[in-house]
């Protein structure tokens, strides 16, 4: 070709194009001009052929040019004869012809014949030339984008195009044969038998270039000359397209989200998280047939690319040469391999697809009315969708294009489609794309497509041709959503909680008798479609990490994954975590509810059932989790723990390894939960250890006692045999024989020693005998005296029916002298229910053997709940404080109240219901003041720490549920301090059960704040102690509670009331010298719903606080106040003694 100057080059360039209305900078292909201007030596630069008269075209110099053609030339099928340009005949195959610049787009030199035999034909994808008046649709700087759509110049066709008309648009042009060559050109030589013609594509249809075919050596046996000629033409065409595409600079701002590697192979770069490949990347065929991809070789036969207004790129993959005949093509069954490859790779972030409405898919049948297997159908999103971590969804900018590629594998040759009306003959297949709303799948979103002039038109379905036993690849680009999703604006830099989403549906439909039937469809993940102005949204880098309110802190909204891009918790770490500090857990009682004590025995049993093992993780799991596979571990098995402790095991879903293996329902263990089980088990072991230590101590004490007894027995035996055996024998012999016969016996002894020894022995024995007699006599007198005193005391204490027998040991303890400096001790009294009693030895302990039995007074009674005693000890060991029985008249402080004694409460006896003065108790009434009253009748020994409360001296003994008789008329009027009404469940329930019109004010709850000890109806002892208007609570105080301890009594009411302390009384002398009752100002009251009164543990054995609850502002402690609505509360404290 001759070298031309710049002016002629520009003239030739613009003469080859119809530039009317298409001279925008984005539409003019100036690559040839820039190449010519940039090169100094442009001798090798080739321009497209300029239209010239037909007479000037000479056949030896190359094929004639088509008027208005530029760039690529259409390739006629092999055997169809040479053609000039698109329709002209090709010259006969020649050998050794040099490559002409005008033929570098597909008309290369005729290759040499291949002599290796026949092989499978390899068809090249047809390429349409640039039509006059149009330019290449894609700008030269957007090589990564899809080709632009072809144009339909008829406006009426654009408005009336429907899926029904898709099957017939351009059919005549596609099926017409190439016109004969011009008459002035010489005719071509006789062609071989013509194969099926390629369809004549419309002028504006451009097909995307596919990867080059494998080398000739991989083609199998030799090819026949026509197939060889066409194969070599295809090789040259693909090489030129690849070289031309490589010169186009890629767009720097495009993000690659999907790989165009072979669909059924897993690229090593994908596993390593490297940059993903773009469409058109050259990928060599794998050496092993088992992993071979479906080669993208176009088959023979007509090509149906679609209507004139839809851009698409179709490629078909034939069965590889090594595939055995009769077996299904691996290219048609590639979905399983693709799922195990890039789709399940955790480092491969791409939008996912899933089948859509499978229950509506139709079935295909062949010409013999046999049902065909399900076709393979896969959709890939090539570009346009970027994953946003902050939004946890894929984002598509409305101004940007998105592109999808569909792979369709057809098994068999379909002729009919099954419909509800029966089998219908097929007209055509087409792809339909539309969007749906996530919250309403029945609402469709239209898809638009950009044209070459940047305008947008509604997207119409793409007609595709599906040859049998082949895979068809369809690429549709330059797509947009017609609208954006709702609620896209962020709130304070965070994703909108009301964000709406779209989903893209790509469906393959069949057209039969003016009806459409879905054969396969896939739907994408949720998509956010944003407006065209990206400034409305903050970048992901600003949204992910933001500055917190505190200095030098940042926060992230959402989940965080380290070494993983799919965190299912707030923080997921694949690898080891090093913590130099401590891990904190919430444990505040105020944030908890339903708190219950655990059974440590069960925890010990569960821990004993758990198996502890040594193990190592599998290499594939260690690689995906980021841990070392060789490091030995010690732990438990989740499946075994799930059977023992199900709440400690959690299912986290499926785990996919790098090699494609999957663990379904992967289980993880909450070791914190197992740790707490260990704490409970250790507590139970501590209890068992303490019990064993106590038993060992008891055994050691008994062992020491037995050893002492053995030593004493041995000393007695040796002393009696060594010291008194000789003297005793002489004394017995001297008393039995006459004195005058003794000298012969003494003659054998020494004369001076025998008389002295006999005299001393006799005097010693006589003195010892006299002393023993005196001691025995004194013991008998003492025992008799004590017995008489005990009988007299019992007569004073026991009632007329003799229902009580007092232990003699208790009286002995009272008469035993006490150390003035030590603490006074009282006899332990067991709780009783009055009836016929019996005296027995009690050996009850707290489960510890070897405790000395104590003499306790018990009765047979029904069991009841144990009362909680007031036990507060500030320092260990706790001193035992016990008061002695009173020996004088009741002592009161005249300044405590208006009277010396409090107003007694109504008695259970009707004739003592009114107020009156209490009578002092007799001195001999010792037992009544320390008597333990309980409904359960359980006696406690010396070592018991939860003693039953001791009853008040003013409480009449109630009738218990004993097995013996009971006196219903039994009363102690002379000893009654105040009557006791019948017990009730709670103070608040009296008001509800009486049903009175004007109920007396009462309290809803009472407790001691220092140890949160509630005072409930359990302390209403005996029966009838609590009733409407009068509540008497008997509160036991343990012997370890120190004297002068200040407590706070909190009383709550449902309505505002007034509470006043009326009196503080005691009938006994103080336990220590100088003890006195507290003075207080009378008629001090508190008002409201919550009242707190100070209470002091006085140095008295028993003392009583009297509070009165009245209406608001009517506090009065006088006896006349009984007429007004008021409730009296008596809190009787009594000290327990071991």
Curated annotation (Swiss-Prot):
Residues 178-198, 286-302 have a biased composition (Pro residues). Residues 67-88, 329-339, 891-900 have a biased composition (Low complexity). Glycans are attached at residues 1030, 1052, 1116. Specifically expressed by postmitotic oligodendrocytes in the CNS. Not detected in the peripheral nervous system (PNS). A motif (Nuclear localization signal) lies at residues 254-257, 491-494. The keyword Methyltransferase does not apply. Residues 587-696 form the Peptidase S74 domain. Residues 680-711 form a coiled coil. Residues 721-733, 961-974, 987-999 have a biased composition (Polar residues). Disruption phenotype: Embryos die around 12.5 dpc. Conditional knockout mice in which Mrf is lacking within the oligodendrocyte lineage display severe deficits in myelin gene expression and premyelinating oligodendrocytes fail to myelinate. These mice display severe neurological abnormalities and die because of seizures during the third postnatal week. Keywords: Acetylation, Activator, Autocatalytic cleavage, Coiled coil, Cytoplasm, Differentiation, DNA-binding, Endoplasmic reticulum, Glycoprotein, Hydrolase, Membrane, Nucleus, Protease, Transcription, Transcription regulation, Transmembrane, Transmembrane helix. GO terms for biological process: central nervous system myelin maintenance; central nervous system myelination; oligodendrocyte development; oligodendrocyte differentiation; positive regulation of DNA-templated transcription; positive regulation of myelination; positive regulation of oligodendrocyte differentiation; protein autoprocessing. Residues 56-150, 171-200, 246-267, 279-339, 721-753, 891-922, 951-999 are annotated as: Disordered. Homotrimer. Interacts (via C-terminal region) with TMEM98; the interaction inhibits MYRF self-cleavage. This is Myelin regulatory factor. It comes from Mus musculus (Mouse). The gene is Myrf.
């Amino acid at each position: 070709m001759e070298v031309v100057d710049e002016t002629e080059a520009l003239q030739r360039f613009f003469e080859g194009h119809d530039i009317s209305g298409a001279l925008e900078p984005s539409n003019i292909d100036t690559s040839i001009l820039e190449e010519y201007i940039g090169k100094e030596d442009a001798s090798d630069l080739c321009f497209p052929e300029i239209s010239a008269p037909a007479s000037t075209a000479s056949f030896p110099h190359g094929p004639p040019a088509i008027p208005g053609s530029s760039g690529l030339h259409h390739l006629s099928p092999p055997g169809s004869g040479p053609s000039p340009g698109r329709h002209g005949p090709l010259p006969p195959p020649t050998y050794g012809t040099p490559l002409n610049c005008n033929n570098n787009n597909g008309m290369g030199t005729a290759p040499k014949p291949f002599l290796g035999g026949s092989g499978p034909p390899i068809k090249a994808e047809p390429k349409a030339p640039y039509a006059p008046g149009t330019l290449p649709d894609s700008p030269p700087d957007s090589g990564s984008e899809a080709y632009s759509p072809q144009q339909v110049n008829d406006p009426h066709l654009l408005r009336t195009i429907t899926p029904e008309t898709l099957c017939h648009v351009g059919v005549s042009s596609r099926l017409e044969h190439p016109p004969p060559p011009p008459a002035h050109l010489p005719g071509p030589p006789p062609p071989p038998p013509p194969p099926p013609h390629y369809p004549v594509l419309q002028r504006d249809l451009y097909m995307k270039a596919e990867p080059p075919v494998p080398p000739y050596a991989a083609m199998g046996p030799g090819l026949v000359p026509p197939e060889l000629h066409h194969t070599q033409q295809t090789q040259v065409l693909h090489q030129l397209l690849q070289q031309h595409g490589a010169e186009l600079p890629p767009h720097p701002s495009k993000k690659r989200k999907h790989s165009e590697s072979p669909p059924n192979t897993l690229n090593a770069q994908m596993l390593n998280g490297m940059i993903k490949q773009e469409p058109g990347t050259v990928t060599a065929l794998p050496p092993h047939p088992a992993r071979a991809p479906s080669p993208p070789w176009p088959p023979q036969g007509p090509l149906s690319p679609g209507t004139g207004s839809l851009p698409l790129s179709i490629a078909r993959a034939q069965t590889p040469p090594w595939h055995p005949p009769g077996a299904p093509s691996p290219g048609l069954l590639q979905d399983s391999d693709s799922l195990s490859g890039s789709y399940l790779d955790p480092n491969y972030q791409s939008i996912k697809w899933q089948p859509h409405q499978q229950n509506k898919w139709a079935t295909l049948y062949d010409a013999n009315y046999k049902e065909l297997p399900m076709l393979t159908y896969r959709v890939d999103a090539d570009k346009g969708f970027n994953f946003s971590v902050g939004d946890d969804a894929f984002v598509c900018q409305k101004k940007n294009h998105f592109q999808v590629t569909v792979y369709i594998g057809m098994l068999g040759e379909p002729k009919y489609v099954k419909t509800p009306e029966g089998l219908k003959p097929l007209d055509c297949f087409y792809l339909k794309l539309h969007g749906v709303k996530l919250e309403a799948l029945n609402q469709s979103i239209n898809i638009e497509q950009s044209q070459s002039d940047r305008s947008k038109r509604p997207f119409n379905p793409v007609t595709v041709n599906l040859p049998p036993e082949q895979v068809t690849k369809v690429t549709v680009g330059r797509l947009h959503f017609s609208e954006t999703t709702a609620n896209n604006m962020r709130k304070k830099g965070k994703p909108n909680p009301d964000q709406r989403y779209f989903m893209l549906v790509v469906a393959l439909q069949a057209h039969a008798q003016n009806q459409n039937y879905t054969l396969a469809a896939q739907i994408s993940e949720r998509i956010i479609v944003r407006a065209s102005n990206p400034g409305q949204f903050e970048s992901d880098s600003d949204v992910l990490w933001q500055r917190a309110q505190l200095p030098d802190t940042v926060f992230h909204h959402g989940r965080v994954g380290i070494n993983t891009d799919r965190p299912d918790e707030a923080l997921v770490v694949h690898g080891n975590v090093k913590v130099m500090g401590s891990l904190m857990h919430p444990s505040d009682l105020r944030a908890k509810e339903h708190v219950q004590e655990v059974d440590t025995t069960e925890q010990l049993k569960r821990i004993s059932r758990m198996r502890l093992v040594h193990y190592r993780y599998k290499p594939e799991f260690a690689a995906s989790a980021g841990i070392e596979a060789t490091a030995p571990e010690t732990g438990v098995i989740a499946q075994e723990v799930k059977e023992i402790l199900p709440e400690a095991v959690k299912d986290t879903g499926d785990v996919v390894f790098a090699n494609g293996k999957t663990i379904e329902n992967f289980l993880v263990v909450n070791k914190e939960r197992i740790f707490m089980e260990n704490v409970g088990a250790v507590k139970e072991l501590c209890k068992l250890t303490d019990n064993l230590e106590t038993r060992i101590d008891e055994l050691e004490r008994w062992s020491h006692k037995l050893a002492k007894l053995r030593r004493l027995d041995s000393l007695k035996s040796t002393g009696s045999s060594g010291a008194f055996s000789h003297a005793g024998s002489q004394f017995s012999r001297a008393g039995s024989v006459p004195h005058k016969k003794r000298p012969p016996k003494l003659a054998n002894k020494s004369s001076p020693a025998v008389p002295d020894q006999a005299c001393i022995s006799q005097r010693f024995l006589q003195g010892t005998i006299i002393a023993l007699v005196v001691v025995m006599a004194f013991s008998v007198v003492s025992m008799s005296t004590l017995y008489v005193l005990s009988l007299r005391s019992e007569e004073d204490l026991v009632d007329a029916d003799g229902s009580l027998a007092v232990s003699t040991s208790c009286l002995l303890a009272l008469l035993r002298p006490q150390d003035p400096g030590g603490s006074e001790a009282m006899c332990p009294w067991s709780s009783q229910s009055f009836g016929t009693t019996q005296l027995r030895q009690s050996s009850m302990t707290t489960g510890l053997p070897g405790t000395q039995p104590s003499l306790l007074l018990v009765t047979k009674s029904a069991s009841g709940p144990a009362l909680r005693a007031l036990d507060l000890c500030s320092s260990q060991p706790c001193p035992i404080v016990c008061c002695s029985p009173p020996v004088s008249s009741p002592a009161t402080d005249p300044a405590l109240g208006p009277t010396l004694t409090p107003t007694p409460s109504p008695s259970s006896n009707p004739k003592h219901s009114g107020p009156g003065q209490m009578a002092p108790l007799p001195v001999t009434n010792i037992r009544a003041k320390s008597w333990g009253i309980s409904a359960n009748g359980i006696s406690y020994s010396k070592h018991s720490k939860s003693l039953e409360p001791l009853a008040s001296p003013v409480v009449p003994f109630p009738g218990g549920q004993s097995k013996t008789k009971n006196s219903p008329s039994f009363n102690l009027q002379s000893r009654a301090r105040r009557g006791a009404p019948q017990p009730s469940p709670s103070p608040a329930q009296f008001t509800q059960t009486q049903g009175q019109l004007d109920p007396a004010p009462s309290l809803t709850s009472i407790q001691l704040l220092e140890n949160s000890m509630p005072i409930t109806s359990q302390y209403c002892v005996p029966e009838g102690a609590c009733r409407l208007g009068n509540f008497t609570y008997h509160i036991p105080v343990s012997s370890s509670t120190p004297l002068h301890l200040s407590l706070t009594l909190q009383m709550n009411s449902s309505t505002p009331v007034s509470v006043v302390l009326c009196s503080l009384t005691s009938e006994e002398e103080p336990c220590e010298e100088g003890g006195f009752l507290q003075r207080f100002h009378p008629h001090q009251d508190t008002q409201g719903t919550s009242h707190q009164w100070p209470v002091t543990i006085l140095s008295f054995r028993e003392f009583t606080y009297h509070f009165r609850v009245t209406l608001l502002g009517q506090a009065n402690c006088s006896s006349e106040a009984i007429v007004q609505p008021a409730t009296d509360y008596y809190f009787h404290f009594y000290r327990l003694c071991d």
